[in-house]
């Protein structure tokens, strides 16, 4: 099992602090395994088994605890007085009124709470209001390229590893089935169907599953493109599948809530304001795109852009698409008063491509760092302060 050091460090940072640790992310990205590793770490450091309580609410053995009153009574009964109690709750959003249990336990002394969820419902609306100031969200993703390399048993060069990474995807279990192409496909297809049926269709009570699947295919085929709800609706209608903009908006919202897609808003770099129209959507894992739409040899540029987005999301900060006049910067990352700007391109060895990619970055007048990430395996180059970096090195080594 790969120790996910960055995430383990975050859990350790917040250990014993009076906040609820909420680990969110797409199904099977490793949330349960992360908490299991952290639990083992606690035991190795001398915490008694009696001080640790863990419950997975997808386990049929725990079905009785889906009643929040039964759950609360059970937890209260198992608390050890005078010592810190570590509570690990997997997929707690399955418990009706779970927020009442969490809120009541939070009021107790010597209780450290860790929960996971595969749906944004866990932190939505009234629940988020109830827990405001009481929780910290730790966003978990499938393996980064660096983690993927660490977990590999094969000794392969970066480019070959990257090709496999975008073909098979980055879910931890993929590495256990040793890249068997048919097994990978079956696993990802099963995972995708579970997400769509359990986290989207059931929760949102969607009746036209075929239409939902059509919208998912459209979105997966258009990662990294500006998505306008009306354009999606018009495209579906032109294909003979009439659908309203309101329905499309509901579908997209549900898919984002299930963490299968991530939404990135646009930011006007000159006006310093968030734009209300247009967004880009990125998949939580490129392997899923291959089972949704079939493996395609093209569109490697948007696939690379998707990979870079996920890496930036792992590293933290608010991520936006930058608007500079009529031009666009792929990503603007805001960390407090500090910004980072990123352009992503498969290759800039063509002079015109180089000029086109550099122009939006050169139009930014501040002194914050600017990067041009490409698949060109060349030494790092500076273009008037803009760092051109081989993207696979950046993925492995950071900036």
Report the location of each language-model feature.
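Pre-Walker A adenine-sensing motif
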Residues: 2-16
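Hydrophobic anchor at the beta1->P-loop junction of P-loop NTPases
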Residues: 23
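Conserved lysine of the Walker
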Residues: 31
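Hydrophobic positions on the alpha1 helix immediately C-terminal to the Walker A/P-loop
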Residues: 34, 38
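Short glycine-rich substrate-engagement loop in P-loop NTPases that contacts/grips substrate
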Residues: 54-85
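Interdomain motor-coupling "hinge/lid" segment immediately C-terminal to the ATP-binding subdomain
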Residues: 118-120, 124-226
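Accessory nucleic acid-recognition modules appended to NTPase machines
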Residues: 181-339
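Domain-level recognition of nuclease-like catalytic cores that cleave nucleotide substrates
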Residues: 377-399
């Amino acid at each position: 099992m790969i120790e996910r050091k960055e995430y383990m460090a975050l859990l350790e940072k917040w250990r014993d602090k009076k906040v609820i640790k909420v680990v969110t992310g797409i199904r099977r990205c490793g949330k349960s395994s992360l908490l299991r590793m952290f639990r083992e770490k606690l035991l190795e450091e001398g915490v008694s088994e009696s001080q640790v309580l863990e419950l997975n609410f997808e386990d049929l053995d725990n079905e009785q605890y889906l009643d929040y009153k039964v759950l609360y009574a059970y937890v209260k009964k198992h608390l050890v007085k005078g010592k810190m109690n570590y509570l690990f709750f997997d997929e707690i959003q399955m418990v009706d009124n779970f927020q009442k249990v969490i809120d009541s336990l939070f009021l107790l002394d010597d209780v450290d709470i860790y929960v996971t969820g595969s749906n944004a419902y866990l932190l939505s609306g009234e629940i988020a209001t109830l827990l405001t100031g009481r929780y910290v969200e730790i966003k978990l993703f499938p393996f980064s390229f660096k983690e993927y390399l660490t977990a590999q048993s094969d000794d392969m060069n970066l480019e070959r590893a990257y090709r496999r990474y975008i073909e098979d995807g980055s879910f931890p279990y993929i590495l256990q089935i040793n890249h068997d192409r048919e097994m990978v496909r079956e696993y990802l297809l099963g995972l995708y169907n579970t997400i769509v049926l359990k986290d989207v269709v059931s929760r949102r009570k969607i009746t036209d599953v075929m239409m939902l699947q059509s919208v998912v295919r459209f979105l997966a085929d258009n990662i990294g493109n500006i998505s306008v709800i009306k354009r999606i609706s018009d495209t579906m209608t032109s294909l003979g599948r009439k659908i309203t903009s309101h329905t499309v908006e509901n579908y997209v919202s549900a898919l984002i809530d299930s963490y299968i897609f991530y939404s990135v808003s646009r930011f006007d770099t000159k006006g310093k304001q968030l734009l209300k129209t247009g967004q880009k959507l990125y998949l939580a894992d490129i392997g899923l795109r291959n089972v949704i739409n079939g493996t395609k040899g093209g569109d490697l540029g948007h696939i690379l852009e998707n990979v870079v987005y996920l890496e930036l999301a792992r590293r933290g900060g608010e991520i936006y698409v930058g608007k500079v006049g009529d031009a666009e910067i792929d990503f603007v990352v805001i960390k407090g008063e500090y910004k980072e700007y990123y352009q992503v391109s498969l290759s800039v060895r063509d002079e015109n491509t180089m000029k086109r990619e550099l122009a939006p970055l050169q139009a930014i007048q501040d002194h914050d760092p600017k990067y041009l990430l490409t698949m060109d395996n060349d030494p790092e180059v500076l273009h008037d302060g803009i760092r051109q970096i081989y993207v696979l090195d950046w993925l492995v080594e950071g900036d």
